[in-house]
């Protein structure tokens, strides 16, 4: 194998760099809009280090320096140091739990003099490197249980440590890594299980306070979830178990049993028919375990565990809600429509909607947003900065920014796909694309009321050095890896 030197100036993807610089520039201008005050600040004050805009400008300058340094590091060092970097950040995340001060109920910030750093933002690139290194290792296979266990552990360990820091929003970002695994050949069954879990949670928690009119003792959420579990189980038996007849028996048996229980409760003796549904789910799992013993077909065992796990997950949903911070509980309950609190936790979302709606088609103009200038929207320069864009630039401006993000993410995916046999860079590229997509969807979703407010920043726009540096590091490493895509040839 011959190796040729890389001409970074010619090999680097300049289009991606231009898109990055455009996003960072628009982000800084949005922070100017969100923090500018007609009565107190002048245009020159925006450049002062005493203001958020001046500080953000300093973070941007430091980000450029970090990018230049990382672009000078050869690919072989990223591959060689992937695991050490990952384990180092795992240690830092663990230490942060104990040494970080309590800031708004979270122990996720390390304070060094006047500077506050959030390790969770930097652990994303460490996890991306480790995942890319593992999946590109010779002999790695999605069919090996040990490899799957290692793969899941790399994602779950930092995620759990961040949860222990009471930073649930940042921890949820790590779920985006499973999209990368799906691209690399992971079976779609895990994604299907994830979708089922979301449905169980939304329906179970969202309808937990409602009861059937004809049977007041039957909880609507519990009834629907216990109806879905055997149906999803039957669907999996038909798809993965390759036994359509067994799938029809499972679905038909559960529906018939539930219907008979409803008739008995409605016209004979009233009782909670969810008890019968629970028994039917247990019988379904036992039947699948019996078929596994009889035929030694592993899919039956896994589907039986899915059925039992679904029941356990449903009952654990309320326990999970109880473990969250009170303000996080209220945000989820408001999002699911269980409670209405327009002057409390729902205040941010309501004011954000008002700000975006008041922008109309073309917006009120740069620095002319009244909702933002009068500070109606809390955290308008950080998590809710998108409402500033909506108010001042209108629907057209919001659409332009979203299209810019879409183009940027698609470009990153293109960089990942053009790597050929270079699996390390491809996996890393998809890690970055998945993280960006998750941040974009959740942040914009929570600003317009479609997602819970969980404190996830908008990449390159939200105020703060940790987020900007974290994404700059992620992108800089990808650009260097991509620049070396043709440096090795046989």
Task: Locate each region found by the language model.
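Transmembrane helix boundary and interhelical junction motifs in multipass membrane proteins
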Residues: 167-172, 364-369, 380-382, 448, ...
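Short beta-strands and strand-coil junctions in structured, solvent-facing domains, enriched
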Residues: 31, 289, 362-363
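Transmembrane alpha-helices of multi-pass inner-membrane enzymes
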Residues: 231-234, 449-486, 490
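Helix-boundary and loop/linker segments of multi-pass membrane transporters
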Residues: 8-10, 147-148, 374-377, 420-421
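TM-adjacent membrane-interface loops and short helices in multi-pass inner/ER membrane proteins
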Residues: 331-385, 393-398
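Pore-lining and gate-forming transmembrane alpha-helices of multi-pass membrane transport proteins
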Residues: 387, 398, 430-431, 459, ...
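Short, Lys/Arg-rich, polar N-terminal cytosolic tail immediately upstream
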Residues: 1-9
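Hydrophobic alpha-helical transmembrane segments of multi-pass inner membrane proteins, especially
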Residues: 21, 25, 37, 43-343, ...
């Amino acid at each position: 194998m011959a190796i040729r030197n890389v001409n970074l100036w010619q090999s680097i993807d300049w289009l991606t760099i231009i898109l990055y610089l455009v996003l960072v520039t628009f982000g800084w201008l949005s922070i100017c809009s969100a923090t500018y005050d007609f009565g107190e600040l002048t245009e020159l004050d925006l450049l002062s280090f005493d203001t958020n805009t001046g500080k953000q400008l300093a973070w941007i300058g430091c980000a450029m320096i970090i990018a230049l340094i990382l672009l000078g590091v050869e690919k072989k060092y990223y591959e060689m140091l992937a695991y050490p970097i990952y384990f180092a950040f795992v240690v830092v995340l663990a230490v942060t739990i104990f040494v970080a001060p309590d800031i708004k109920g979270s122990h996720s910030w390390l304070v060094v003099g006047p500077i506050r750093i959030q390790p969770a933002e930097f652990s994303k690139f460490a996890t991306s490197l480790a995942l890319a290194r593992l999946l590109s290792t010779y002999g790695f296979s999605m069919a090996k249980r040990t490899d799957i266990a290692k793969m899941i552990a790399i994602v779950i360990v930092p995620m759990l440590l961040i949860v222990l820091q009471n930073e649930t929003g940042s921890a949820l970002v790590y779920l985006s890594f499973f999209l990368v695994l799906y691209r690399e050949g992971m079976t779609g069954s895990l994604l299907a299980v994830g979708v089922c879990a979301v449905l169980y949670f939304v329906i179970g928690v969202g309808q937990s306070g409602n009861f059937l009119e004809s049977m007041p003792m039957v909880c609507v959420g519990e009834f629907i979830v216990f109806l879905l579990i055997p149906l999803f189980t039957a669907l999996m038996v038909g798809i993965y178990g390759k036994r359509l007849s067994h799938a029809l028996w499972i679905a038909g048996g559960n529906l018939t049993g539930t219907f008979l229980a409803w008739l008995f409760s409605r016209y004979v003796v009233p009782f909670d028919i969810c008890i019968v549904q629970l028994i039917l789910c247990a019988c379904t799992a036992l039947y699948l375990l019996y078929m596994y013993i009889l035929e030694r077909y592993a899919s039956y065992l896994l589907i039986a565990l899915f059925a039992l796990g679904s029941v356990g997950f449903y009952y654990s949903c309320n326990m999970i809600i109880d473990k969250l911070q009170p303000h996080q509980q209220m945000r989820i309950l408001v999002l699911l429509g269980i409670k209405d609190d327009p002057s409390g936790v729902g205040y941010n979302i309501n004011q954000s909607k008002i700000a975006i709606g008041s922008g109309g088609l073309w917006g009120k103009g740069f620095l002319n947003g009244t909702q933002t200038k009068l500070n109606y929207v809390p955290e308008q320069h950080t998590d809710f900065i998108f409402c500033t864009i909506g108010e001042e630039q209108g629907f057209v401006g919001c659409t332009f920014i979203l299209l810019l993000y879409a183009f940027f993410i698609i470009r990153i995916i293109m960089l990942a796909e053009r790597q050929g046999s270079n699996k390390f860079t491809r996996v890393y590229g998809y890690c970055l694309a998945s993280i960006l997509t998750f941040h974009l969807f959740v942040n914009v979703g929570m600003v317009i009321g479609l997602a819970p407010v969980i404190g996830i920043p908008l990449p390159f726009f939200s105020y703060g050095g940790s987020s900007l540096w974290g994404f700059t590091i992620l992108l800089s490493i990808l650009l260097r890896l991509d620049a070396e895509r043709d440096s090795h040839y046989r």
